[in-house]
């Protein structure tokens, strides 16, 4: 029977296979959110998820929600919409604003887990070149976006948001296009939910996810792929 691990100042984690089954995937408690610990967590297939004012909780659920990068991504109606849209798309031009957008209130939630502490932790990771954002612009207004952490040839998605219909889906379509161009193998979406299912996510057993992660996590990627840049959607 697996038991919950308590972290100290060391950045080490127990093996993800030791995570609890109830609640599904809870692996460890405690520690901190400094960049080296966060980077090590994603490298091992672990991520933080906890409510504000609660202890830090670390997870590795079974199964794992994943996407295989594909282009073009989205339904026929989304592609038709984007062909007519005047939106602009960028990479890493407004990381903090994207994270703040993801932290905003949602109709389906009473609050958000993306506290000020979380926002600054991922911003530090971004400053070190380990966390990146996709932005969707309507003129000068940020209307949608997403952020996440690449680990070799795997992209670990954290959150997305929209202020106009289809803006988060557009950001995800741009992410897919960008990852396909750079030969990424998998998008980790963490915990399955109805929204992810509607986008085409698949449930992958944790053992299979970890096998793929271990295979591709040390793969070198283009140093310039996450430079600040404007991206043009291709059809």
Swiss-Prot record:
Species the sequence originates in: Shewanella frigidimarina (strain NCIMB 400)
Localisation: Cytoplasm
Main location: cytoplasm
Family affiliation: Belongs to the L/F-transferase family.
Keyword annotations of the record: Acyltransferase, Cytoplasm, Transferase
GO CC annotations on file: cytoplasm
Record EC number: 2.3.2.6
Pfam families per the UniProt record, alphabetical: Leu_Phe_trans (PF03588)
Its biological purpose: Functions in the N-end rule pathway of protein degradation where it conjugates Leu, Phe and, less efficiently, Met from aminoacyl-tRNAs to the N-termini of proteins containing an N-terminal arginine or lysine.
Reactions mediated catalytically: N-terminal L-lysyl-[protein] + L-leucyl-tRNA(Leu) = N-terminal L-leucyl-L-lysyl-[protein] + tRNA(Leu) + H(+); N-terminal L-arginyl-[protein] + L-leucyl-tRNA(Leu) = N-terminal L-leucyl-L-arginyl-[protein] + tRNA(Leu) + H(+); L-phenylalanyl-tRNA(Phe) + an N-terminal L-alpha-aminoacyl-[protein] = an N-terminal L-phenylalanyl-L-alpha-aminoacyl-[protein] + tRNA(Phe)
InterPro entries per record: Acyl_CoA_acyltransferase, Leu/Phe-tRNA_Trfase, Leu/Phe-tRNA_Trfase_C, Leu/Phe-tRNA_Trfase_N
Source lineage: Bacteria, Pseudomonadati, Pseudomonadota, Gammaproteobacteria, Alteromonadales
Gene responsible for this protein: aat
Enzyme class: transferase
BP GO annotations: protein catabolic process
Name of the protein: Leucyl/phenylalanyl-tRNA--protein transferase
Source superkingdom: Bacteria
Gene Ontology MF annotations: leucyl-tRNA--protein transferase activity
């Amino acid at each position: 029977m697996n038991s919950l691990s308590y972290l100290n100042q060391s950045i080490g984690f127990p093996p993800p296979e030791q995570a609890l089954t109830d609640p599904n995937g809870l692996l460890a408690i405690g520690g901190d959110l400094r960049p080296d610990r966060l980077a090590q967590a994603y490298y091992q297939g672990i991520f933080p998820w906890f409510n504000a004012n609660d202890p830090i909780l670390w997870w590795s659920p079974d199964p794992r929600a994943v996407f295989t990068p594909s282009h073009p991504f989205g339904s026929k109606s989304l592609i038709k919409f984007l062909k007519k849209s005047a939106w602009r798309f960028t990479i890493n031009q407004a990381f903090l604003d994207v994270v703040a957008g993801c932290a905003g209130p949602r109709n389906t939630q009473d609050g958000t887990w993306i506290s000020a502490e979380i926002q600054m932790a991922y911003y530090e990771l971004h400053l070190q070149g380990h966390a990146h954002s996709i932005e969707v612009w309507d003129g000068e207004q940020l209307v949608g976006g997403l952020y996440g952490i690449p680990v070799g040839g795997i992209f670990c998605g954290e959150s997305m948001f929209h202020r106009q219909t289809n803006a988060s889906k557009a950001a995800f379509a741009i992410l897919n296009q960008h990852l396909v161009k750079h030969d990424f193998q998998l998008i980790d979406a963490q915990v399955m939910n109805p929204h992810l299912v509607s986008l085409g996510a698949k449930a992958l057993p944790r053992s299979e996810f970890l096998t793929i992660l271990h295979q591709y996590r040390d793969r070198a990627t283009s140093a310039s792929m996450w430079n600040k840049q404007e991206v043009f959607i291709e059809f």
